C-alpha cells in the first residue's frame, strides 16, 4: 500500500504479544508492572487529551489505579514506539466500563470520543490501539452466549476468546469481510452511489459483504452488478482496513467496466442504492461544495481520493 493510498485505521504500532495470552498469570504480571497502562472505553468511546507540540489529540492512557473496576479487560499488547510519557514496550490493557465506572474516571461526557470522529487524526500507535480495542469490545458485546447451545460463555486468553463450558465450544473474535470498489469507465470517471436513507447529495463508492464460499474478486463483480447493473473486470486490490462497526474488514479494490460486454446502462437496485452516477474529476471539483463525501477515516474516502489523484479537499 502506497503513501498515496492512506488508510488511517490500517495503522498500528502495537506488538499484540499473542504468546502471552495463554499465560494463566498474565494479568497478575500486568498489574504488577509499573509500566502497564489502561485504555478506558465507555459505549465505544475513549479519552483523548491535548499534548504540547502535537496538533492532534492523543489517547489518554491511565494508570492501573485510576480504573479500579471494569466490565471487561483485554490485553491489547505492547507499544512499539515512544509516545509522550509512554516508552516503546508499554503494555496496554483495554478496560470496558459501565456508566458508573466511566463517570468515576471522567464525568464530562464531552471528553469521551468515538473512532469515526477522531480516527483520521490519530497517531499510528493510537489508531491501532483504538481500532483494535473497539473491534474486540464489540465482539464480546455480541458473543456472550454459545452459538451451539445458548449457554453463557466465559472469557479466556487474555480477552481474545470465549469458551462455553457446557459443550467446550471456543469462539474467537469475528471479522466480517466486505469489498469496497472504485469503478472507473473508459473516460476515467468514477462510479458513485447514494442510498435512499441518505441526504440527496451524499455519495460514496459501492460496497458489500462477501458471501459464504465466495472469493473477494467474485464479490466485487457480483456487488457492482447487483447495485449498479453493470459488469466489471480488471479487479485490482489496493488495500484494507478494519471497520469496527461492529467488526468488519473493508477490502478496497479498483475495477473497470468490462469492455467485452459493450455499452452498459446504469441501473440502481432501488433496494440498497437509490441512484448511481458517473463523476468526472472536473465535476467533483466543481460540485464539491454541495457534495457530501465519505469522511477521511474511511477507506471509501481513500478510494475516491486515490482516483482523484490526491486529497479532494487539498
Question: What residues fall within each predicted segment?
Answer:
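N-terminal alpha-helical interaction blocks
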Residues: 1-122, 313
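Short Pro/Gly-enriched beta-strand edge/turn motifs at strand-loop
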Residues: 56-60, 161-166, 235
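Unchanged
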Residues: 67-121, 210-298, 303-307, 314
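Cys/His-rich short segments
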Residues: 131-184
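A generic structural signal for well-ordered coil/turn residues at beta-strand boundaries
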Residues: 142, 177, 186, 199, ...
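Short glycine/proline-enriched turns and hinge-like loops at secondary-structure junctions
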Residues: 158, 175-176, 204, 247-248, ...
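N-terminal strand-loop-strand
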Residues: 161-204, 209, 231, 255-257
